[in-house]
């Protein structure tokens, strides 16, 4: 949304056609939606000034979809911003950085890969998190945890521990060294 507001040409990639249609409708054609596959990603890398990585695959290691070769094809001094670096990288040249040393150059491309980027904006992030969580808190308060889990699949998918047990497959697998 911010890039569109600044007049940038924005390309959004996804494998879910329904999600792409929804985005296209929501932004009234002001962005370009494309199916995420190697050919499209290679093509866009050659002219992108800013590449934003934001892939999260719950329960799985994030696949590398932007190879070092694709990064090499980018114009020098382009920028990679990786929003979900704390979930392993979808860009081969990415590695976590810190708020005190947030950027590095690799293949002539400036990388910004700070985990928990919202930590810089603590108050704003807190308000956003409160707003996102409030409907779940109200549901649990109204019907109790067990009934809320039964009636709300997204709440159930977000549950990591329950009654002293690890119930989320991704957390369990990562703690057991399978991820």
Which residues does each PLM region occupy?
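Electropositive phosphate-/nucleotide-binding environments in soluble metabolic enzymes
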Residues: 13, 17, 38, 42, ...
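Adenosine-phosphate binding glycine-rich loop
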Residues: 85, 90-179
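Structural beta-strand/beta-sheet cores of well-ordered domains, especially the beta-sheet scaffolds
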Residues: 6-8, 29, 46-49, 62-64, ...
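Short, glycine/charged-enriched secondary-structure capping and boundary segments
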Residues: 3, 25-27, 48, 65-68, ...
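ADP-ribose/adenylate-binding Rossmann-like module
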Residues: 51-110
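Glycine-rich phosphate/diphosphate-binding loop of Rossmann-like nucleotide-binding domains
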Residues: 1-56
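Hydrophobic/aromatic beta-strand patches that form the interior of the parallel beta-sheet core
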Residues: 11, 34, 79-81, 112
């Amino acid at each position: 949304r911010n890039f569109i507001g600044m007049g940038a040409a924005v390309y959004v990639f996804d494998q879910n056609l329904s999600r792409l249609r929804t985005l296209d409708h929501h932004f009234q054609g002001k962005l370009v939606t494309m199916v995420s596959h190697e050919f499209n990603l290679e093509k866009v890398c050659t002219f992108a000034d800013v590449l934003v990585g934001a892939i999260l695959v719950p329960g799985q290691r994030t696949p590398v979809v932007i190879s070092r070769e694709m990064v090499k094809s980018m114009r020098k001094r382009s920028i990679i911003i990786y929003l979900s670096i704390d979930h392993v990288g979808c860009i081969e040249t990415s590695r976590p950085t810190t708020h005190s040393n947030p950027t590095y150059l690799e293949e002539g491309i400036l990388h910004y890969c700070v985990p928990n980027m919202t930590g810089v904006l603590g108050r704003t992030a807190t308000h956003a998190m409160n707003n996102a969580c409030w409907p779940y808190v109200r549901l649990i308060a109204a019907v109790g945890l067990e009934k809320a889990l039964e009636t709300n699949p997204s709440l159930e998918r977000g549950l990591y521990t329950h009654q002293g047990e690890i119930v989320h497959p991704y957390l369990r697998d990562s703690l057991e060294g399978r991820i």
